[in-house]
Amino acid sequence: MLVHRMKLLTASAGILLFAIIFGWVLFPQILKFMISKQVTLKPGTDIRDLWSATPFPLHFYIYIFNVTNPEEVAEGGKPRVQEIGPFVFDEWKDKYDLVDDVVEDTVSYNMRNTFIFNEKASSPLTGEEIITLPHPLLQSIGITVQRERAAMMEMVAKALAIVFPDAKPFLTAKFMDLFFRGIDVDCSSDEFAAKALCTVFYTGEVKQAKQVNQTHFLFSFLGQANHSDAGRFTVCRGVKNNKKLGKVVKFADEPEMDMWPGDECNRFVGTDSTVFAPGMKQEAGLWAFTPDICRSLGAIYQRKTTYHGMPALRYTLDLGDVRLDEKLHCFCDDPENLETCPPKGTMNLAPCVGGPLIASMPHFLNGDPKLIQDVDGLHPNEKEHAVFIDFELMSGTPFQAAKRLQFNLDVEPVQGIEPLRHLRKLIMPMFWVEEGVQLNKTYTNMVKYTLFLGLKFNSGLRWTLITLSLVGFMSAGYLFYQKSDSLDITVPPNIIRESNKVANAPKPDRQQQPKAHLVPLPGVNLSNPKVEHRDRY
């Protein structure tokens, strides 16, 4: 019995120890190792194929801030805007001219985005709607010259009147013309001023303009970005070090930017946003470099959530206030003078795009209250305007995401150009975009069956083993309790034999036993006994 109890106790302890070591230590490490070997950008892997050409389109939404009182604003009035949208596009992403460097464990490629108008999802909008926005060329050129080349203002004003005859502070046109097809820029004049102004178009300084013949260009917000090169990246493949998977090490063949007055702002941090390393720490955040704004942005952990029944972590992004972070003072015009920093919740894009453009969250969400007060018709809210990503850390999978950004014009009165003389100084919202993705079951099932079923199996196994070990401990304890309640006494054999001899010996006859003779004590008469009573003290 003692041997059986000890075996049961030892087996229970062994099962418990195995459950703890395997369930909480070995299995997670084995799973992470298997994922790290699968999730790399090595040629021939499934991840490489998915990464190089996304097999499904992202959803790209455009919302317009249509100005409903342009004449009033031109005379110094407060702008009133009406949001129109979304205009929905299918955005296809692919990478081409891929070159691997096995020694450095990197891959270089060109990124390309292709936008296709989705009529069904955009309905009832058709893209032919007439909208009114700040004149993107007249205002941008006038404001930039006033700030940087004031001595040339007279010549520029003359050139603008020739190239854009009868131009006003606000431009009214069809949505598709402004954003993709383009509005005409006539550079056919032989006037010296006009030729000087058109030089910036011929040299490619105006990136949004496309030359159609020797004297004409088409300007649009996104036309030049459609199905064209978005820049050459060099990123880590993650074969030698899985933690560096997707990390941007070069852009345009440069190891860092030369855009901002500070090293911290010029560094590439994170990935190209199309892939993330598995097994990242929750507090590390999700960082990605965005060439459109010449900056790396990081999303921070907010809360736990679920997606199609699978646990995920939600990360959110905010432009914050660069004045409060000394490392970000390099995003100010003059890092030594905080008065030159952009308002809270905004980012100055002038060094990046070459014009008075300001980025912000849609409707100036989480921005300086004055930004909202300066314009009627803005209604920021977290649900519709915040940036978020639902992310699975162990596999590095983004389940769903919404990347949102608003583009604004940094407006100010331009004294040298008559149509712009009476404008208010403010940050004028023009439009905001959302790039969204939601993985369907085809791709979430890949994560579910390769990761979560394994995790569920491990969870079920370890708790089953722990339950068995507890049952074993309880059974052993019960047996030990029974032993202590009824002890087994073992008597030596010689004592048993002697005891039997005594028990089996013949008993003497009571009648044959001699009578005992009583010997009286001196002075005691046995024939007349008396009882003596004494007090007891």
Curated annotation (Swiss-Prot):
The keyword DNA-binding does not apply. Its main location: membrane. One of its GO terms (biological process) is pupariation. It holds the Pfam family CD36. It is a multi-pass membrane protein. GO terms for molecular function: scavenger receptor activity. Residues 1-7, 481-537 are cytoplasmic. Residues 29-459 are extracellular. InterPro entries: CD36_fam. It is found in: Cell membrane. Coiled coil: none annotated. The keyword Lipid metabolism does not apply. One of its GO terms (cellular component) is plasma membrane. Disulfide bonds join 265-330, 294-352, 332-341. Keywords: Cell membrane, Disulfide bond, Glycoprotein, Membrane, Olfaction, Receptor, Sensory transduction, Transmembrane, Transmembrane helix. Residues 503-537 are annotated as: Disordered. Glycans are attached at residues 66, 213, 226, 440. The chain crosses the membrane at residues 8-28, 460-480. Plays an olfactory role that is not restricted to pheromone sensitivity. Belongs to the CD36 family. This is Sensory neuron membrane protein 1.
